[in-house]
Amino acid sequence: MDEKVFIKTYLSIAEDLIVWYRNIREVHRNLDNFLVLLSVANFHKKEITEGVVGSPNIDDQELTSKSIIARIPKEKGMSINGIVRETGIPRTSVKRIIDRYLKKKVFKKNSQGLITIGINYRSNNKQRRIASYHFFQQVTKKTKAHALQLSEE
């Protein structure tokens, strides 16, 4: 592999990552908020996928959120310690972030005190998508070109 091409691709992706991080900060105030949100979303990815696909109107955030929430078993959720382990964020910060998301109904606690998705989970979904779209589009383009070059070698 040509070292110059690798470095050029790496630096180009790093530049896009900086832009993506700025966009994430605009939407979520900081990366920790975003990581906690992603951690809970990743835990519920099956229910989110099924809920979005099963929703009669994907553009209706409330209807889609209800479709997702209906698919989450009552006993399923993530503990604060699980989020701390997954994200590497200090427990006090995770607790503060979760409390803020609980007030906004982005998250809710189930009967066992586990964190799960709330009715307003999709409230800033469009901003998240806009903030991430350019970054993932650029990374895909750059890594495809790099992968093609590697396969030719």
Annotate each language-model stretch with its function:
Residues 22, 99, 103-106, 141-148:
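Charged/polar positions within long, soluble alpha-helices
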Residues 35-76:
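Short helix->loop/beta-hairpin flanking segments within DNA-binding domains
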Residues 32, 76-79, 93-97:
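Amphipathic alpha-helical interface surfaces
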Residues 131-153:
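Amphipathic alpha-helical dimerization/coiled-coil segments
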Residues 1-38, 42:
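N-terminal leader segment of winged-helix/HTH proteins
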Residues 61-66, 79, 106, 111-136:
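Short, cationic-aromatic polyanion-contact patches
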Residues 69-70, 75-85, 101:
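A short alpha-helical element within helix-turn-helix/winged-helix DNA-binding domains
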Residues 88-103:
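Short amphipathic alpha-helical interaction segments
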